[in-house]
């Protein structure tokens, strides 16, 4: 079990589906079905592997729809940010934000927004009802201590390194796309410094960011004339930050549209801050009440919830609690891996919050809520575009982090179909767990709610459970392979549940994660 050295393993309680529940998408009272597990703790790599098998978390509850039985099959969807080009409607939203910030312009007429997974609470309500019925009573501290003792008894050092200093120094990390300068908070839009005018015979006005890059490049050239490129790469700046001069007719990039300079007398100032939500950073704690008030108004106005709901504890349970262990490896993103809130601050107050997970291969969007007074800004679309840009920023240092997961795509649900407009994107095949371009999937979904997207009839799940006896079980304060555990069990339903769990999480996760059994 060397894979646990230096860190804690994932610990989960598995609960197989026993019934159908109300569907939050089509409102069928007994149409939704999913299997779930309560994650006491989970490594970011395990969760990455799980979402690549169709799982998804809500708080600490991780669930996987029974795709061929549930009324609204939910297909994991991911966007490829490195090839992403904003559509006309996306550009319209970004320009609308710029006009509002620059001149305070408010568009006329109503605006239909696209909040990420706006029906998530309803969609998993049945699953949470199941968890409540089971009356889970587990002392997490005791469980953690038991695991630690078990690991130590096997000669493994399970002491977890707490990146306390890094977490404190990175309570919030401002987005600084294309900037190599360390900063804790960076304004989304900066006032341009005085430069050359609009006279066409003179060079165009340059952004301060570009000027800083040029100065840094010249300085490195003086220090190492023969190796300026290597100098930038050594400092973590990939060559992509310094592309060849674009042709005048080349369309603007996503970053150009988001970070377009504002006039000196701009009406509003927008900042985006990324704060770690689990374990909660000091900045997260300091803004928790304000963030909750935004969520409460969002639920009351957008989802018509009564004023006494949701409570702060419900908010914390769904959107702040996370099983993901914070990790800050040297080759990872500066903010580390784990669960975060991406806060949108307008003139010093929070107007929207995107709940995200930063994982080894992707940024995963969990939820978005916003102040209904700013619905006219299409914050659902705007935040998705910002998260795509954020993924591209993280990719510059961590090359394998190159995807943006948008949760589930439900072809039969109009509220969820918009996710397919962020192209290029892929859907996960529910049988072989390979990614298939969405264009190839849509014709099949027009004919049937449930589809196998992989067209190769011989293809199988490459990570299917082939050696269930190697599955790791945590039972009576001891860690053991399932092959040992099953000799102590006489209940056939227990074996069926464990084997089902193994088939759903796959061989790799079954050998790494600890399945908690009473």
UniProtKB/Swiss-Prot annotation:
Subcellular location: Nucleus; Cytoplasm
Protein name listed in UniProt: Arginyl-tRNA--protein transferase 1
Annotated stretches, region: Disordered: 175-203
Originating species: Homo sapiens (Human)
Protein family per UniProt: Belongs to the R-transferase family.
Annotated Gene Ontology cellular component terms: cytoplasm; nucleus
Self-association state and partner proteins as the record states: Monomer. Interacts with LIAT1; LIAT1 is not a substrate of ATE1, the interaction takes place in the cytoplasm and seems to increase ATE1 arginyltransferase activity.
Swiss-Prot/TrEMBL keywords: Acyltransferase, Cytoplasm, Nucleus, Phosphoprotein, Transferase, Ubl conjugation pathway
Catalytic activity entry: an N-terminal L-alpha-aminoacyl-[protein] + L-arginyl-tRNA(Arg) = an N-terminal L-arginyl-L-aminoacyl-[protein] + tRNA(Arg) + H(+)
Task of the protein: Involved in the post-translational conjugation of arginine to the N-terminal aspartate or glutamate of a protein. This arginylation is required for degradation of the protein via the ubiquitin pathway. Does not arginylate cysteine residues.
Gene: ATE1
Organism taxonomic ancestry: Eukaryota, Metazoa, Chordata, Craniata, Vertebrata
GO biological process: proteasomal protein catabolic process; protein arginylation; response to oxidative stress; ubiquitin-dependent protein catabolic process
């Amino acid at each position: 079990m060397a894979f646990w050295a230096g860190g804690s393993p994932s610990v989960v309680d598995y609960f197989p589906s026993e019934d159908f529940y109300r569907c939050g998408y089509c409102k069928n009272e007994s149409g939704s079905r999913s299997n779930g597990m309560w994650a006491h703790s989970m490594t970011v790599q395990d969760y990455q592997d799980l979402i690549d098998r169709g799982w998804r978390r809500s708080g600490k509850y991780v669930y996987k729809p029974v795709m061929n039985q549930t009324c609204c099959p939910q297909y994991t969807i991911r966007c490829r940010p490195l090839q992403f080009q904003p559509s006309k409607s996306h550009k319209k939203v970004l320009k609308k934000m710029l006009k509002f910030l620059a001149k305070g312009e408010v568009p006329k007429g109503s605006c239909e927004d696209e909040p990420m997974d706006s029906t998530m609470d309803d969609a998993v309500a049945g699953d949470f009802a199941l968890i409540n019925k089971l009356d889970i009573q587990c002392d997490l501290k005791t469980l953690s201590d038991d695991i630690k003792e078990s690991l130590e008894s096997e000669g493994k050092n399970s002491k977890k390194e707490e990146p306390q200093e890094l977490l404190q120094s990175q309570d919030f990390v401002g987005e600084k796309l294309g900037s190599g300068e360390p900063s804790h908070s960076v304004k989304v839009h900066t006032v341009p410094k005085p430069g050359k005018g609009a006279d066409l015979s003179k060079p165009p006005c340059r952004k301060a960011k570009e000027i800083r890059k040029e100065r840094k490049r010249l300085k490195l050239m003086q220090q190492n004339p023969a190796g300026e490129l290597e100098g930038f790469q050594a400092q973590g700046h990939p060559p992509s930050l310094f592309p060849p001069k674009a042709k005048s007719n080349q369309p603007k990039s996503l970053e150009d549209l988001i970070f377009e300079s504002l006039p000196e007398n701009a009406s509003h100032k927008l900042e985006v801050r990324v704060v770690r939500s689990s374990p909660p950073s000091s900045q997260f704690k300091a803004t928790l009440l304000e963030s909750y008030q935004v969520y409460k108004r969002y639920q009351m106005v957008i989802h018509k919830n009564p004023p006494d709901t949701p409570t702060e504890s419900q908010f914390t349970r769904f959107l702040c609690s996370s099983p993901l262990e914070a990790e800050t490896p040297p080759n990872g993103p500066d903010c580390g891996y784990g669960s975060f809130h991406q806060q949108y601050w307008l003139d010093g107050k929070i107007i929207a919050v995107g709940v995200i997970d930063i994982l080894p291969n992707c940024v995963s969007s969990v939820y978005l809520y916003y102040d209904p007074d700013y619905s006219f800004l299409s914050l659902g679309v705007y935040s998705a575009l910002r998260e795509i840009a954020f993924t591209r920023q993280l990719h510059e240092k961590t090359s394998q982090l190159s995807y943006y997961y948008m949760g589930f795509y439900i072809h039969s649900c109009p509220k969820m179909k918009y996710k397919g407009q962020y192209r290029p994107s892929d859907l996960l095949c529910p049988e072989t767990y390979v990614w298939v371009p969405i264009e190839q999937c849509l014709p099949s979904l027009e004919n049937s709610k449930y589809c196998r997207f992989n067209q190769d009839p011989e293809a199988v799940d490459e990570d299917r459970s082939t050696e269930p006896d190697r599955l790791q079980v945590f039972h009576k304060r001891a860690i053991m392979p399932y092959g040992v555990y099953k000799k102590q069990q006489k209940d056939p339903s227990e074996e069926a549940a464990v084997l089902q769990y193994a088939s759903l999480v796959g061989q790799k996760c079954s050998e790494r994660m600890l399945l908690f059994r009473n």
